[in-house]
Design a protein with these regions (language model features):
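A positional/architectural concept
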Residues: 27-34, 38-40, 47
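Residues at alpha-helix boundaries and short interhelical turns
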Residues: 15-18, 39-43
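Short N-terminal secondary-structure initiator segments
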Residues: 1-12, 78, 85, 91
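Active-site flanking loop/helix segments enriched in acidic
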Residues: 2-24, 61-72
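An amphipathic alpha-helix signature
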Residues: 4-8, 29, 33, 84, ...
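Divalent metal-dependent catalytic cores for phosphoryl transfer on phosphate-bearing substrates
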Residues: 41-108
Length: 108
């Protein structure tokens, strides 16, 4: 399953939040890819970088953050851990690690 299918799966009922997520994640992906492309000597996996950037905030759907149209029950600080659980359930453990570790020290 690609990142678009995963976002569509979890965000089908909240178009406003989906738009916010896609705009933010696209900006993160552009920045991450720009940085990665400046270092061809590292042989980075650009496809993985794009996918991970697009999915890093997937867990916000389960949080309570009405200012950004999130109406779940969990504290926002947990969105990385929640997203990691979602991505592991989708068979994406490598992406899950990025998700759970992008918020501070990964202790959310």
């Amino acid at each position: 399953m690609n990142w678009r299918q995963i976002i569509d799966k979890y965000y089908s009922d909240n178009a406003e939040l989906k738009d916010i997520l896609l705009r933010h994640s696209s900006a993160v992906a552009r920045k991450a890819l720009d940085i990665a492309k400046r270092h061809p000597e590292l042989n980075l996996d650009l496809n993985f970088i794009e996918e991970a950037a697009m999915l890093h905030d997937i867990g916000v759907i389960k949080t309570d953050a009405p200012d950004i149209k999130c109406y779940g029950n969990e504290p926002y600080i947990r969105h990385g851990v929640l997203g990691a659980e979602m991505l592991r359930a989708e068979g994406m453990p490598r992406h899950a690690r990025v998700c759970e570790r992008h918020t501070g020290a990964g202790l959310s």
